[in-house]
Amino acid sequence: TLFAVTLAIMSFATNAQKANINNLPSQHSNSTNTTTTIHFTAEPISEAVFKRMQGKSYKANCTIPRTELRYIRVLHYGFDGKVKSGELVCHRDIAADLIEIFKELYKARYPIERIQLIDDYNADDETSMLHNNTSCFNYRRVAGSKKLSYHSRGKAIDINPLYNPCVKRRKDGSMTVEPKAGRAYTNRTKTFKYKIDHNDLAYQLFKKHGFTWGGDWRSLKDYQHFEKK
């Protein structure tokens, strides 16, 4: 009798293991969909996110309603080849564009060093660029101007800014470079990693979605910058 009971218990345990294995999610059929659902999302600005932004990217005089902004989560490949989690705040009008673009960049393993809210750098653009941070919304004026930047509307994004600086050339031949540490990457005839040009995938995807590239401007060259009107 004891032997029969033991066999019954062993049989039950084996069947339970089989049932648990059969109930595990398929790594091939569901993992990609789950990743897309969790990480490539656009949501209204939550209280927690807004607290991070207040007094930084979302300044006291900000004229852009919070309701027009969206919090985006993406995945991307870092310079070390590892998958990273990124976050952006943008205008709702370009949220779907950014989700689609970053999905394609992720599939292609396009390297982006980091994607953090600029609030992590106290909304200081120079510091954010120095750390090669890809960012979007920041209520501020164009450097050296009284005009509001497209970043103020959440309709512009800077990609790998250290390697793709903003370059302003003067008539006397001198130039201003933002970030300052990006001066080594102002000669765009050279070949180097992470350079955005017309052959670059990021350029091609943003253009496909109707964005303008700062590298095509005449008055200055903002190689990191994409905006959509």
Locate predicted features.
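N-terminal module-boundary/linker segments of secreted carbohydrate-active enzymes
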Residues: 18-82
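Catalytic cores and adjacent binding grooves of peptidoglycan-active enzymes
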Residues: 142-144, 148, 154-229
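Bacterial N-terminal signal peptides
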Residues: 2-11
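Active-site-adjacent substructure of cysteine-protease-like catalytic cores
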Residues: 125-152
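Structured segments of extracytoplasmic/periplasmic soluble domains
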Residues: 77, 97-111, 140, 162-165, ...
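A generic secondary-structure signal marking the coil-to-beta-strand transition
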Residues: 70-72, 133, 155
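Sec/Tat signal peptide C-region and signal peptidase I cleavage site
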Residues: 14-15
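Active-site acidic/histidine clusters and adjacent loop/turn architecture
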Residues: 64-129
